[in-house]
């Protein structure tokens, strides 16, 4: 299909988009580039500031606008206009000028928009774990999710679990739900730092496990700390490197309380926090790890689980419904409240680990990755095309 015949689909990448959201869009756009003859053409609207989230992604048109640069005159004019006219009319005009036929992963910008929209609800965590949210946050999420369901032509969810949640949350809009299982696209191994370089940069030695979750309360880091304490008491040394954002907006005290707990458990030498690190370093740590860990109490569709599947890495993961749905072939499940079970999984994984066989599995997994990326992209493409035809 010729480029001028393709349906143009717009994405809005605001500067304050959360890290998980940016990674989600990156994985989707990289997968889309694998389609041999696409019928849609992605346009990403973002700020004029440098944005590494879009670096190296082919087949994507990027439209940079000062309307997305915070505290600039165009941004301020956009905000004032949106408030006065009850709609983001300045950005809507830009989308119309670029011929956008479908707006993806957000609600319509203006009332009765001429551009159909496909909303996105990452998860219904606040329904399942209300204690992790304040009353105001729960009300806002209820309101925002219901607005998406009502105003959007379709609503993307990442799992069958989330589709059932939407059906229970807004049964009158259940028919709008579209399940899109995303696939992680790891960096090319040739550009990743080698293990000796990573060891020197981050100051660790020996085999290690990687916990690449944000430091948010529901991510359940405490169970990992407890498992390390149990192992240390038995004179078994297991090193866990933890990466991710250390600020939890809803629980600002969480990280400090976690580190106090790690101190009390005497495992600061085994639970090493690296924080937010460059993407290629994170990918390199995944490649060389004994295994990944995801102990989370709740997920919409876990990025780290998908990364383990795309890389061909073992992962120790909490036994929750969405992790069962993701079904990693090399997954080792444990109850999210069972430190003993996690400790056992860590020991067994360390004992089983062999560098040569691990890299052979990774190599064979990469051979099959493209077909999964294509399936991911084709599913999204059909959602967009069917929305545009309505």
Where do the model's predicted regions map?
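Carbohydrate transferase catalytic cores enriched for Leloir-type hexosyltransferases
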Residues: 1-390
């Amino acid at each position: 299909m010729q480029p001028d015949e393709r349906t143009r689909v717009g994405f809005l990448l605001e500067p304050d988009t959360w890290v998980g959201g940016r990674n989600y869009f990156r994985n989707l756009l990289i997968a889309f580039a694998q389609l041999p003859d696409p019928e849609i053409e992605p346009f990403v609207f973002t700020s004029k500031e440098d944005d590494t989230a879009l670096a190296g992604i082919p087949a994507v048109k990027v439209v940079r606008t000062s309307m997305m640069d915070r505290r600039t005159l165009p941004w301020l004019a956009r905000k004032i206009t949106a408030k006065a006219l009850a709609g983001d009319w300045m950005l809507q005009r830009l989308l119309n000028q670029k011929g956008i036929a479908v707006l993806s992963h957000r609600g319509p910008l203006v009332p009765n928009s001429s551009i159909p929209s496909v909303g996105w609800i990452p998860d219904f965590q606040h329904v399942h774990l209300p204690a992790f949210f304040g009353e105001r946050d729960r009300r806002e999420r209820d309101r925002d999710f219901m607005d998406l369901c009502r105003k959007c032509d379709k609503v993307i969810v990442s799992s069958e679990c989330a589709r059932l949640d939407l059906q229970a949350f807004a049964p009158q809009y259940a028919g709008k739900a579209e399940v899109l299982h995303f696939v992680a696209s790891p960096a090319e191994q040739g550009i990743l730092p080698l293990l000796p370089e990573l060891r020197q940069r981050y100051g660790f030695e020996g085999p290690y496990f990687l916990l690449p979750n944000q430091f948010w309360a529901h991510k359940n880091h405490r169970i990992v700390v407890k498992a390390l304490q149990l192992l240390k008491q038995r004179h078994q040394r297991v090193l866990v490197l933890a990466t991710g954002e250390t600020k939890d907006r809803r629980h600002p005290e969480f990280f400090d309380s976690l580190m106090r707990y790690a101190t009390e458990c005497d495992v600061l030498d085994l639970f090493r926090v690296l924080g937010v690190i460059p993407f290629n370093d994170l990918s390199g740590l995944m490649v060389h790890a004994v295994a990944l860990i995801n102990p989370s109490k709740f997920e919409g569709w876990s990025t780290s689980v998908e990364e383990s599947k795309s890389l061909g890495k073992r992962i120790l993961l909490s036994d929750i419904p969405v992790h069962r749905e993701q079904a990693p072939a090399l997954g080792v499940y444990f109850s999210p409240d069972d430190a003993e079970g996690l400790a056992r999984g860590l020991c067994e994984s360390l004992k089983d680990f062999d560098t040569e066989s691990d890299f052979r599995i990774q190599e064979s997994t990469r051979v099959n990755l493209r077909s999964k990326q294509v399936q991911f992209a084709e599913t999204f493409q059909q959602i967009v095309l069917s929305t545009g035809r309505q």
